[in-house]
From Swiss-Prot:
Pfam families: Rubrerythrin. GO terms for cellular component: chloroplast thylakoid membrane. Its EC number is 1.14.13.81. It comes from Chlamydomonas reinhardtii. The gene is CRD1. Catalyzes the formation of the isocyclic ring in chlorophyll biosynthesis under oxygen- and copper-deficient conditions. Mediates the cyclase reaction, which results in the formation of divinylprotochlorophyllide (Pchlide) characteristic of all chlorophylls from magnesium-protoporphyrin IX 13-monomethyl ester (MgPMME). Pathway: Porphyrin-containing compound metabolism; chlorophyll biosynthesis. GO terms for molecular function: magnesium-protoporphyrin IX monomethyl ester (oxidative) cyclase activity; metal ion binding. The lineage of its organism: Eukaryota, Viridiplantae, Chlorophyta, core chlorophytes, Chlorophyceae. This is Magnesium-protoporphyrin IX monomethyl ester [oxidative] cyclase 1, chloroplastic. Keywords: Chlorophyll biosynthesis, Chloroplast, Iron, Membrane, Metal-binding, NADP, Oxidoreductase, Photosynthesis, Plastid, Thylakoid, Transit peptide. InterPro entries: AcsF, Ferritin-like_SF, Rr_diiron-bd_dom.
Length: 407
């Protein structure tokens, strides 16, 4: 189910699934996300539309763009209610809470005078693709902020410890979103996050699906950030903007968030040890991996501007994320079988043709898409039935597999 908050309010339909108060309650501090930017000649010819001076029109929503999520908050409350679940294992959850309270990055996201000067030196195609990267990243972080903030509000009475953890995660996500939106203003653009809150389409996921998906999102985010950071530390000439210097500490927020969501899953064994859990584990792994792989291959010029090979980078991130996920999920796809990435590479080629047809004004473009969509669906099915690994050795650190990876 996909609706905007504006449409829901207009129709008078209010549901526990929709985070209606997030627009009012979940608004971060003014200094965190509200920025101002003025249009500048450097952005002329890059193809960006503005709502008003310096405020960018959000990118069109597609299957691959960052989504805003909502869930059945009443059901989520029941999952972690102490009254309903008196034997809920809180030991690991409380350990995560103490980590969040430490707020290791409280003073990390402090800008310096190098940001704006560096932004003014980024021009042409590199400028365009980096602005797109900042927008997508900001939107994804802000989406997490809205979801976590509303979960914290709704669970405060039934499970105060879990609610506080979601609240502290929303603090981190707001910081990240604000930092990225401020970076956008260095490029003379910014997002109106309040407008996005009210007008973005919200995708409904059941509570357990939210936990699976956000766990994977946080863990893959960790590997993306740390991989880029380590690469640029070894190749400083490729670092054209100081944002990347913050990725080492930043990625630890993502890792801690993933650890908390892992603890949520372990506190509810039925989310990990049933046949249904095996099916959903593999499905969400594939969904996250496919989305990232196709997205990034549409933006190879961004990774090339950092001196990265897009294909090697993506495969490294997926392999490492999968290895981390093996310690928790009962089943994961065998991504280290070379045939796995062979199928993904075929999907990249088909997706490129679909993108080209979407931009075409030809009246036959819709018909020309049909065989490509059929081929894409067949590749998805191949991956769904692809060789899998029965794993789930929870809390076993590391991996005995040899690591001949690019980064």
């Amino acid at each position: 189910m996909q609706t905007t908050l504006k449409q829901q309010r207009a129709s008078g339909r209010v549901s526990a699934r929709q985070p209606f108060r997030s627009a009012a309650v979940a608004r971060p501090r003014r200094s965190t996300v509200r920025v101002q930017a003025s249009a500048a000649p450097l952005n002329d010819g890059l193809g960006f539309e503005t709502m008003r001076d310096g405020i960018k029109v959000a990118a069109k929503e597609t299957l691959l763009t960052p989504r805003f999520y909502t869930t059945d908050f009443d059901e989520m409350e029941q999952l972690f209610s102490k009254e309903i679940n008196p034997n809920l294992d809180m030991e690991e959850l409380n350990a995560c809470l103490n980590e969040f309270r430490n707020d290791y990055n409280k003073v990390h996201f402090v800008r310096n005078e190098t940001f704006k000067a560096a932004a003014d030196k980024v021009t042409g195609e590199t400028r365009r693709i980096f602005i797109e990267f900042l927008e997508r990243s900001c939107t994804a972080e802000f989406s997490g902020f809205l979801l976590y903030k509303e979960l914290a509000r709704r669970m405060k009475a039934s499970s105060p410890e879990v609610a506080e953890m979601f609240l502290l995660m929303s603090r981190d996500e707001a910081r990240h979103a604000g930092f990225l939106n401020k970076a956008l203003s260095d490029f003379n653009l910014a997002l109106d996050l309040g407008f996005l809150t009210k007008n973005r389409t919200y995708t409904y996921f059941k509570p357990k699906f939210i936990i699976y998906a956000t766990f994977l999102s946080e863990k893959i985010g960790y590997w993306r950030y740390i991989t880029i950071y380590r690469h640029l530390q070894r190749n400083p000439d490729n670092q054209f903007y100081p944002l990347f210097e913050y990725f080492e500490n930043w990625c630890q927020d993502e890792n801690r968030h993933g650890d908390f969501l892992a603890a949520c899953l372990k506190a509810k064994p039925e989310l990990l040890n049933t046949f249904e859990a095996k099916l959903w584990s593999k499905f969400f792994c594939l969904s996250v991996y496919i989305t990232m792989y196709l997205n990034d291959h549409q933006r190879t010029k961004f990774y090339e501007s950092l001196g990265l090979n897009t294909r090697q980078f993506n495969q490294h991130v997926i392999i490492e994320t999968n290895r981390a996920t093996e310690r928790l999920f009962p089943v994961v796809p065998d991504v280290e079988d070379p045939r796995f990435f062979e199928i993904l590479n075929k999907m990249v080629d088909v997706n490129a043709k679909l993108v080209e047809l979407s931009a075409s004004s030809s009246p036959l473009a819709g018909l020309q898409k049909l065989p490509l969509l059929e081929r894409m669906a067949s590749y998805c099915l191949q991956l769904l039935f692809f060789k899998e690994k029965d794993v789930g050795s929870v809390d076993i650190a590391g991996s005995g597999a040899s690591r001949n990876l690019a980064y």
